[in-house]
Amino acid sequence: MADVFPLILGIIILLASVISIKTGISVTVVEIAVGVIIGNLGLFHSESWMIYIASFGGILLTFLAGVEIDVDLMKDNFKESFTIGFLSFLIPFVIVFLVTYYIIGWELNPALLTSTALSETSIAVVYSVLTQKGLFKYKIGKLIMVATFITDICTAIALSVLFTKFDIYTLLFYVVSLAVLVMAYYKSDLFFENPLFKNKIGELEIKYVFVLLLGFIFFGSLGGGQAILPAFILGVILSDHFKKHTKGEVKARFKTVAFAIITPIFFIIGGMKVSIPLIYSCFGIFLTLFVLRQLSKYIGVYYPSKIFLKQNYNYVTMMMSTGLTFGLVAAVFGLNNALINQTEYSVITGILVLSAILPTFVAEKYYTPVHSEDLGD
């Protein structure tokens, strides 16, 4: 019998885009919500190839987010970005850990894993929303992206330091990642500037980057590392090539490939992983941790944003309060390594998905900067 699930997936992706356009809600939010619904109603079952594409989609989004980083802006606004990004990580991490370990009574590893997963800000959600709203051309969008980068670097470091079991393969992952990043910095012109390869129908520039990202994923899984951090740094390294040498043409083609099919699978599969029955069985814990996470994110982002920014601090706070990408990576890592159980995994994932939907909806509905004087230069 022919496999009907790829066709169903294609229809779901198309319908999510139609709903997004009709309602004005971010397609990212719609895709996650659809994933939650179809997953819990048993209307769709993910296959192994979909799960792999979903994981690759998260890495690809992370790379594209890195491409959008303005290095000059990061240097010029490092104090603001670092303060907002670091507090966005630190305060949720500390508060969630104290509550899960000392009040709820979870064991040390689940408490640490949960606090790590819930401290992140979703690069994928932030990047998708800022791209769809066209905010990357303005200072506010770039500032949010840099602050998100700082937050997730802290999360990645925490996950690596607290849980990674270092062995020869872990060392290999870091050595290979460093070598690839150095090579990409010095040798990428061979693909981006060579007339033999540049702007050809074969899209060698895109395939070149895909190979590097797949390499990060392979060596990361081999050595227990996380491909998100080197993927993001690769994007930052190649951002200059995309901006100066290709005049944005390759980046535009990258976005077409990513947003047409790959990233929708990431968001839909992410939503499908939420088990509503398991969340319902410990709804009090779920609600408590969700509220604590959002409040601690608010405290960590709103007040420094209000100090550094004359306006739009509500929008910055809402966008920095989103969660999903690296939190899902941390949750899957914890489940696969028996650091958390299925119920704890569902609670973490449910909180991440809800935090991807609600703050994004509020930000877009009430706080999106619309006037040129609101956006900055």
Residue ranges, per PLM feature:
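Membrane-interface junctions of multi-pass transporters
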Residues: 19-23, 36-80, 195-205, 211-288
